[in-house]
């Protein structure tokens, strides 16, 4: 019984995160792009998101080319309150972000666009607010794979 309780607590401690896609204009592709790279707006948080997306592309063995440009613009980033996330949980003190993603082909024609809202409501020791960028980056990759872009 104690083992199940500990497992439950561990799962509870690391959960509480999610993403939501909206304003999606992302048509299903007939043919995958040969490569992709992310380029985000010039500020510290956007550059962190850019790095995370490019790391995931590399992990997926997607070549870093300009065939598909993933342009990201973090519209909102709220770090929330780590202490409240740790002490209260259940979404209190949540870190949130809202990001616009635009996709361009190598001729710089827009081929898709969508927005992502990400939330991190809890985590071990309150979680790091920038983990919300991890969820955003992973959702970008998930959407591109689901629509056969990569």
What spans do the regions from the language model cover?
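Sec-dependent bacterial lipoprotein signal peptides
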Residues: 1-17
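A structural "domain/chain start" motif
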Residues: 16-60, 113-117, 146-150
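Composition-driven detection of intrinsically disordered, low-complexity segments
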Residues: 8-9, 25, 90
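Contiguous N-terminal and early-domain "leader" segments and peripheral loops that mark the onset or edge
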Residues: 11, 20-22, 100
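Surface-exposed short loop/turn segments
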Residues: 59-131
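C-terminal/domain-edge helix-coil "capping" segments
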Residues: 22-26, 109-114, 120-150
